[in-house]
Amino acid sequence: MITRLSHLFLRTLRDDPADAEVPSHKLLVRAGYVRRIAPGVYSWLPLGLRVLREVERVVREEMNGIGAQEISLPALLPREPYEASNRWTEYGDGLFRLKDRKGGDYLLGPTHEELFALTVKGEYNSYKDFPVTLYQVQTKYRDEERPRAGILRGREFVMKDSYSFDLTDEGLTASYRAHRDAYERIFSRLGVKYVIVSATSGAMGGSASEEFLAESEIGEDTYVRCLESGYAANVEAVKTLAPEAVPFDGLPAAKVHDTPDTPTIATLVDWANGADLGWTVTAADTLKNILVKTRQPGGKWELLGIGVPGDREVDDKRLGASLEPAEFELLTEADFAANPFLVKGYIGPKALQANGVRYLVDPRIVDGTSWITGADEPGKHVVGLVAGRDFTPDGTIEAAEVRDGDPSPDGAGALVAARGIEIGHVFQLGRKYTDVFSVDVLGENGKPVRPTMGSYGVGVSRLVAVIAEQHHDEKGLRWPAEVSPADVHVVIANKDETAREGAEGLAAELDKAGLEVILDDRKASPGVKFKDSELLGVPLVVVVGRGWGEGKVEVRDRFTGESREVAAESALSEIVKAVRG
């Protein structure tokens, strides 16, 4: 097919959009691939839609290749299935909720575990029907609080979600592995650099969970890996290596000290090092106690104390992942006023436990470790408070930040931190949703069997932005051949009618050879055409210009920047060879 730029619905921009923060957003808008309609909501224009459809094609080919079958479920969904699974509440403000004219509650689907489970229940009732894997490529909706980076994090997005149904845990493992392998093929074909990391399941539920993260400095997900062992995990999933417990023998008794004007860790350390305690105190010797309030879905707010070494900050993402499905908030001044035993800047574990406040600590706070922490009175701290002897936590929590150089959970070396963009996620859900909806089938022995599920997502529209993020330069986009909106971009760079006829003829021959061709036949200057060819990012640019009269055309590689002249009579074969390898 030949796409003529003189007819194409396209307007390129020379300047970056004012609201664009990241390269992919800037370039996709400037190149006329997408246009913003509202925060987190974008229109796909002709060239952008082509790239999106190419990504969808690759995803479909690999899903079909593992025996998955495509269906399409509605995006407008009734409340009842999500009420049954408790996700009507668990999703909180992230759901788009609406009512019909009769007052019935509906939502715009963020994901479809419930509906797939009910669909299988309605159609299959025998072990002979299993295993089965179904998938869809569909628009999803999530009410993101802060949509950003164009189509990287939007409120409306295209996602491939698939669901496997097996009768045994071994079957689920096989389905999980098949999807994992298919995802590796998808991302490799798309030219995406990625890592696979251990992850948490969040509101999805289930056990085994891995994320596919595209390597990117602008990614919202922080992950760590151990270069020695290959261990990799999202920071929310990192397990802290706990030290061995320390014997209590010989540990001095805890002692309360006057510590005026020491409400922060820094001021406390300064005081300690001027108090002649007998050793040099660092922030790691202090115990920082953070108070939050938590609420289970449909429940009431409750206080929660969190103890971490003073040299660590609490990571909100890790804390949120540890508390799911509960939500949490920091305490307000009104909360402190209602709980006078909470002395800001001087909170210790004893008052928390004396007042029935649940107290969870970092795994590094083991029995026998001695701490400097709040004494629950203004201007007072206690030195030598020993875990397991002077206070007993209610458990541990993974809430402290993970840092470069921390020991890997597998003990093989140090962790190195990096950032990425989530492009895929695989879960072994187990029977969470088949239990909710009592999905039972007749087993081979005549008894009921409950299928076990897997859930597998790929961010299809997000992948367009990810590819743009990883494949661009200062001039514009550089699409991998697998997803490019065309195979060849032919530029008519001369007003000479002979050159124009030559370009038209070459484009027609390329079309007959089965290539997708963009032909820039506009009445614009060569400079404008060259800039647009670089901005649009088709991997091969063919220039028909002044050299045509000498029987030559120019072939430019958008990825390498290399340019070469080829004879006009051999241009067709040279271009086809370059495109098809």
Curated annotation (Swiss-Prot):
This protein's record includes keyword ATP-binding: yes
EC numbers for this chain: 6.1.1.15
InterPro entries listed in its UniProt record: aa-tRNA-synt_IIb (IPR002314), aa-tRNA-synth_II (IPR006195), aa-tRNA-synth_II/BPL/LPL (IPR045864), Anticodon-bd (IPR004154), Anticodon-bd_dom_sf (IPR036621), Pro-tRNA-ligase_IIa (IPR002316), Pro-tRNA-synth_IIa_bac-type (IPR004500), Pro-tRNA-Synthase_IIa_type1 (IPR023717)
Molecular function (Gene Ontology), one example: proline-tRNA ligase activity
Key word Ubl conjugation present: no
Primary enzyme class: ligase
Catalytic activities: tRNA(Pro) + L-proline + ATP = L-prolyl-tRNA(Pro) + AMP + diphosphate
Subcellular location: Cytoplasm
Pfam families: HGTP_anticodon, tRNA-synt_2b, tRNA_edit
Family: Belongs to the class-II aminoacyl-tRNA synthetase family. ProS type 1 subfamily.
Function: Catalyzes the attachment of proline to tRNA(Pro) in a two-step reaction: proline is first activated by ATP to form Pro-AMP and then transferred to the acceptor end of tRNA(Pro). As ProRS can inadvertently accommodate and process non-cognate amino acids such as alanine and cysteine, to avoid such errors it has two additional distinct editing activities against alanine. One activity is designated as 'pretransfer' editing and involves the tRNA(Pro)-independent hydrolysis of activated Ala-AMP.
HAMAP family per record: Pro_tRNA_synth_type1
Domains as described in the record: Consists of three domains: the N-terminal catalytic domain, the editing domain and the C-terminal anticodon-binding domain.
Quaternary state and interactors: Homodimer.
Annotated protein name in UniProt: Proline--tRNA ligase 1
